[in-house]
């Protein structure tokens, strides 16, 4: 199925590994041009070169910390200078650290807010005007299953990703008439560094191995396994495409059935 992404320009944050990299690879395979960033300059340059060589896509790779407004602005400026526009925005960042409420001070909340909430807001603030002017745009936010079903020991993620969900849903209402869609993608337990980190935290807390922590999650998932980044990326490419032009304001899970709620 042709998704109609050939020639579109996609900006993908935190794309040196994990879900961000998988989405960047999928969009490039569909013919999109890419602007990708990561805090690790060497890693993102390597990923950019690899994607370009494998797919033939035009790729701009830049080091940027999405929690810093100056870095977001510099990255967006570079993308607009090279490509002239951005049609697709995928906001993404490493999740905030685990922890219970009593272990988190104001500084932890502030740092997590900059990373998880303000980063997508800043990207949208810069790129939304151009999308509205062209009457076509896709904003996709990578959030978490915690917005549907909070997870123990993830106070920051549970709280701030819910804030992103409310912001995105409201923004979808505000810009729908301009041809711009806004959706959230909800990854479940997927084979990424983030899940490895969480498995190690649980292992230390509960006196088990990381492998046993993963097996515990797998028993909670109807499909009986962790997801793969490419499975998440397939949904992202579809939601970013012309084929998904009547989908907006939604939070769509790729979780193997882990979420138990009806809605």
Feature names for model-found ranges:
Residues 129, 173-174, 245:
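Alpha-helical segment proximal to the catalytic Tyr-Lys
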Residues 90, 176, 181, 247-249:
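Short, small/polar-rich loop/turn modules that mediate ligand/substrate recognition or access, typified
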């Amino acid at each position: 199925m042709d998704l109609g992404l050939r020639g579109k320009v996609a900006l993908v944050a935190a794309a040196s590994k994990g879900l961000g990299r998988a989405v960047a690879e999928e969009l490039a395979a569909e013919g999109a041009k890419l602007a990708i960033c990561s805090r690790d300059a060497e890693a993102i340059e390597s990923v950019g070169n690899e994607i370009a060589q494998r797919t033939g896509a035009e790729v701009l790779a830049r080091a940027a910390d999405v929690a810093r407004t100056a870095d977001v602005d510099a990255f967006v400026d570079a993308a607009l200078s090279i490509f002239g526009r951005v049609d697709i925005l995928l906001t993404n960042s490493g999740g905030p650290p685990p922890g219970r409420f009593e272990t988190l001070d104001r500084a932890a909340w502030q740092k997590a807010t900059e990373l998880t909430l303000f980063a997508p807001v800043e990207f949208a603030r810069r790129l939304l005007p151009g999308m509205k002017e062209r009457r076509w745009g896709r904003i996709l936010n990578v959030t978490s299953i915690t917005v549907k079903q909070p997870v123990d020991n993830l106070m920051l993620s549970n709280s701030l990703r819910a804030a992103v969900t409310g912001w995105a849903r409201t923004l979808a209402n505000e810009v729908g008439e301009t041809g711009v869609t806004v959706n959230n993608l909800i990854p479940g337990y997927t084979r990424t560094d983030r899940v490895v980190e969480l498995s190690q935290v649980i292992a230390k807390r509960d006196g088990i191995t990381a492998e046993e922590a993963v097996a515990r999650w797998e028993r909670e998932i109807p499909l009986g396994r962790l997801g793969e980044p490419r499975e998440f990326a397939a949904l992202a490419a579809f939601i970013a495409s012309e084929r998904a032009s009547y989908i907006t304001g939604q939070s769509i899970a790729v979780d193997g059935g882990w979420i138990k709620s009806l809605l």
